[in-house]
């Protein structure tokens, strides 16, 4: 049974909004990336994301988007297909007065097929039961800038497509995570 005193909150760990709490709703498969994993990731990426464009697929709580905004990313796009979860991200955006975060209530594939934008950094952290990796790998190159950094988190060990080169990896609890770099000259679908 769920603890009635438990609050669905997660803390921003770095940058301008460091220590601010954001609330998130209950949704199937929603599990914010752990603090220690985010700390490691942003040590890998750097604490200052000034000038970068960021895509947060499967945004969930929005914590990865808020971490990027807190570190001065130029533009952040959050994709979330659960309407209540997307609305909660919008509420937190307003609360934190973040103007460069754009939230889209849509599925990842619709966004990837239709956006003209490309990104420097992409966060991919779908629910554990999600298994559409092959299709994702087909659409992903369309939105990647040369040398884009792609963070992937999932329950199983991660098999990267040929166009992504693993740079760093780790494990926390049952989550495996990888930071990879896009190489345009390698084989793409």
Regions found by a protein language model. Name each.
Residues 1-189:
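Class I S-adenosyl-L-methionine-dependent methyltransferase catalytic core
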């Amino acid at each position: 049974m769920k603890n009635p005193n438990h609050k669905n909150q997660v803390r921003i760990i770095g940058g301008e909004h460091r220590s601010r709490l954001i609330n998130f709703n209950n949704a199937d498969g929603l599990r914010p990336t752990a603090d220690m994993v985010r700390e490691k990731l942003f040590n890998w990426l750097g604490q200052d994301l000034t000038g970068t464009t960021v895509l947060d697929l499967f945004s969930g709580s929005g914590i990865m988007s808020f971490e990027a905004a807190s570190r001065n990313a130029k533009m952040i796009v959050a994709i979330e297909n659960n309407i209540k979860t997307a609305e909660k991200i919008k509420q937190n955006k307003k609360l934190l007065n973040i103007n460069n975060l754009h939230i889209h209530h849509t599925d990842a594939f619709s966004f990837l097929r239709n956006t003209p934008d490309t990104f420097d950094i992409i966060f991919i952290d779908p629910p554990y039961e999600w298994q559409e990796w092959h299709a994702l790998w087909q659409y992903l190159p369309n939105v990647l800038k040369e040398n884009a950094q792609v963070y992937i988190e999932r329950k199983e060990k991660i098999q990267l497509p040929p166009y992504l080169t693993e740079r760093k990896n780790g494990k926390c609890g049952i989550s495996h995570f990888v930071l990879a770099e896009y190489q345009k000259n390698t084989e793409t679908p």
